[in-house]
Amino acid sequence: MGWQEVDGSDSNSMGGKRMRPTLAMLAADAVGGDLERATPIAVALEYVHNFSLIHDDLEDLDRVRHHRPTVWAIWGESAAIVSGNAMLKIADAAAWKLRSVGVEESVALEAESELTNHYLKMMEGQYLDISFETEASVTVDQYLDMIERKTGALIEASIYLGGLVAPRSGPDRSKAKALKSMGYE
């Protein structure tokens, strides 16, 4: 399950913006939190994002992403499905490590639940995106609803969860919620 080139050699690619984990860490810093406490959720968010890209490439039959062949284009559809699914479970396992960096049990459970709710919302957006392919037209409101779910859900989760788990004295929900809403203001 490592990163490999077409010839099977290890990849040293540093591609991608890592926007979601960066937002989580920035939110953690914004609330005066401990960045180590936010690291497991930041890692989880990146794995969820990669899961979504692997499946999106297959669903859209995109053979190239960022000038590189996609997983399914190299290894086949079945391998892409399994790889994407594995990424999602690795994301869950990363989130479970919140406790090992000192996040309280109740906060860790809340963060894991929020992560799941947000990636399910992201999947709803992907479903809408796929369904639009057979529509003669899509309204602006329909598109905005789709993109809010498909892309916005994980961005919202990144900002919210980074702010939620990082404070050493426990979560400041008012600050975390303020961060969560900033993309909507």
Annotated model-derived regions:
Residues 1-185:
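Mg2+-dependent prenyl diphosphate-binding active-site environment of isoprenoid biosynthetic enzymes
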